From Swiss-Prot:
Protein name: Histone H2A.V
Known partners and oligomeric status: The nucleosome is a histone octamer containing two molecules each of H2A, H2B, H3 and H4 assembled in one H3-H4 heterotetramer and two H2A-H2B heterodimers. The octamer wraps approximately 147 bp of DNA. H2A or its variant H2AF/Z forms a heterodimer with H2B.
Keywords from the named record: Acetylation, Chromosome, DNA-binding, Isopeptide bond, Nucleosome core, Nucleus, Ubl conjugation
GO-annotated biological processes: heterochromatin formation
GO cellular component: nucleosome; nucleus
Taxonomic source organism: Strongylocentrotus purpuratus
Positions in coiled-coil regions: none
Protein localization: Nucleus; Chromosome
PANTHER family the UniProt entry points to: HISTONE H2A (PTHR23430)
InterPro entries referenced in this protein's UniProt entry, alphabetically: Histone-fold (IPR009072), Histone_H2A (IPR002119), Histone_H2A/H2B/H3 (IPR007125), Histone_H2A_C (IPR032454), Histone_H2A_CS (IPR032458)
Length: 125
């Protein structure tokens, strides 16, 4: 078996499942967490972890991209909870997906239409 195949060359370098999938998020760790959380005695398909990692990575990249743009608009180099809040609430799809309250996120600027007076009438009073 193994001895015949391996003889003459060194053992192959280990390649992580994240690297195989071309992801930054840890596929192995996500797989372990999925196994720990399931009721069916830790039976989780191999591709389930890869797919989950890809989804989490995409969503994280999306939020960070928008938050980075928000911080750039305000001419600062550091992303704060405020920038995350502005990014998430500014995007319709992310807003519907992430309904959690962001600590230190502040509020979204909004003035109701009826409260904004007309330019002409404001000068008269």
């Amino acid at each position: 078996g193994k001895a015949g195949k391996d003889s003459g060359k060194a053992k192959a370098k280990a390649v992580s499942r994240s690297a195989r999938a071309g992801l930054q998020f840890p596929v192995g760790r996500i797989h372990r967490h999925l196994k720990n959380r399931t009721t069916s005695h830790g039976r989780v398909g191999a591709t389930a972890a890869v797919y989950s990692a890809a989804i989490l990575e995409y969503l994280t990249a999306e939020v960070l991209e928008l938050a980075g743009n928000a911080s750039k608009d305000l001419k600062v180099k550091r992303i704060t909870p405020r920038h995350l809040q502005l990014a998430i609430r500014g995007d319709e799809e992310l807003d519907s997906l992430i309904k959690a309250t962001i600590a230190g996120g502040g509020v979204i600027p909004h003035i109701h239409k009826s409260l904004i007076g007309k330019k002409g009438s404001q000068k008269a009073t």
